[in-house]
Amino acid sequence: MAEITAKLVKELREKSGAGVMDAKKALVETDGDMEKAIELLREKGMAKAAKKADRVAAEGLTGVYVNGNVAAVVEVNAETDFVAKNAQFVELVNATAKAIAEGKPANNDEALALIMPSGETLADAYVNATATIGEKISFRRFALVEKTDDQHFGAYQHNGGRIGVITVVEGGDEALAKQVSMHVAAMKPTVLSYTELDPQFIKDELAQLNHAIELDNESRAMVNKPALPFLKYGSKAQLSADVIAQAEEDIKAELAAEGKPEKIWDKIIPGKMDRFMLDNTKVDQAYTLLAQVYIMDDSKTVEAYLDSVNAKAIAFARFEVGEGIEKKANDFESEVAATMAAALNN
């Protein structure tokens, strides 16, 4: 039997990322053959990864990488926040973002087939990470954003990397693009413009807003406060030319009823129309970047602010770790119970 020296164990650890005891056991089982030991560790890693496959990984990090006119934002998950701070995990996240920005895959399958600098596929890198770190490590999603030479990327990560944002701004500079990314991180828009909102989604959200007004009016009635009006519209998508024209006619009728002289109507109507637009685009304000009040200047929307500096938002991508993942509170308890049951049955 070959002598398993500390130097040999160290070499295997450096090549495989395995722990001391795992590396030593692999060398003993393969009689000191380095290549066979690496393959054995890989097989064991796949087995460990398979055992962890049904666990919920809802913690993790986002990664952002800019490669010329292409940028990538990725989300990589782990089971605990503690592991999300692990240096090996952070390195994997950054390497994933870089590989995707450079490889420009079309979907997750193509992304996982990318070859890493180590020579392994991205998929194998995750199998090995799961084995060596000891938790389920999973690549969840990515977005690629592209720009032209005269546009600017704004790359931003918030809350220790739990939120990752890329924006594209035309005009201005990289600093402005980063400010817009900071806004996106804080205000959570889902689309750029109202034109991207689904009509049924707008109707559903408007119904929710009116339900909230109904509940508020019940409370107001108890203290003899006047009821708030219900919203008829929620988005610019619902404000046709006829609707806007009718709103202006209604304002004129209101001014006439109040006895306001016609010669000052032109000074009053624009402000009232702005109020009409504000009151009837609540869904846009919640979900579309351009309609949101800009956090850097709350006197303007994002669109109005960018217009004022001769700039324009072109695109953005925002990931927040764990979005849409149902995290089961009893995962750990279930795992312990299953382990104890297995032990009793053996």
Swiss-Prot record:
Positions of the UniProt region annotated as Involved in Mg(2+) ion dislocation from EF-Tu: 80-83
Domain of life (superkingdom): Bacteria
Signal peptide: none
GO molecular function: translation elongation factor activity
Keyword field: Cytoplasm, Elongation factor, Protein biosynthesis
GO cellular component: cytoplasm
Localization per record: Cytoplasm
Entry-linked HAMAP family: EF_Ts
Entry protein name: Elongation factor Ts
Naturally occurring in which organism (per UniProt): Streptococcus equi subsp. zooepidemicus (strain H70)
Record lineage: Bacteria, Bacillati, Bacillota, Bacilli, Lactobacillales
